[in-house]
Amino acid sequence: YALPSYVDRRDYPLPDVAHVKHLSASQKALKEKEKASWSNLSMDEKVELYRIQFKESFAEMNRGTNEWKTVVGTAMLFIGFTALIVIWEKRYVYGPIPHTFDPDWVAKQTKKMLDMKVNPIQGFAAKWDYEKQEWKK
C-alpha cells in the first residue's frame, strides 16, 4: 500500500494528487470558476489552473539538464589523473628500453631470420626474394 504522491514524469503523466495541496483564497475562487464554461476563462487563468494541478509542463520535463558537463568534467579529471600516474611510472618505475628495440638490432635480427629461412612456406621468408635480396612485391 502506498500513499498517493505527486511526481512529474513523462511515463506517468497523471499523478495521483495535485501539485498544490493547500489552495489560497484566489486559487479556491479560480477552482470554482473552473466548474463553469472554460471559454469564460482567460489564458492566464487556464495556466494558473494548470500550475495548480501540475508543477511542470511536458516541455519543461523534456528540457535538457547540464548534468553532462559534470559527467564529462569528472571523466576528464580521472583521465588526467591516470595520465599523471602513467607519466610518473614511465619516469620512476620502468627501466630503460631494452636494446632489442634498437633499429640496428631489429635489422640484424631480421637478417638472421632471413638467413635461417624462417617459415618459408607462408611466413616471414616466403615474402623475401633471395635472388634480388629485397622484399617481394
From Swiss-Prot:
Pathway(s): Energy metabolism; oxidative phosphorylation
Q: Does the keyword Phosphoprotein apply?
A: yes
Q: Where is the signal peptide?
A: none
BP GO terms, sorted: mitochondrial electron transport, cytochrome c to oxygen
Top-level lineage group: Eukaryota
What is the recorded membrane topology of this protein?
Single-pass membrane protein
List the protein's name. Answer: Cytochrome c oxidase subunit 4 isoform 1, mitochondrial
Q: What is the lineage of its organism?
A: Eukaryota, Metazoa, Chordata, Craniata, Vertebrata
Q: Which gene encodes it?
A: COX4I1
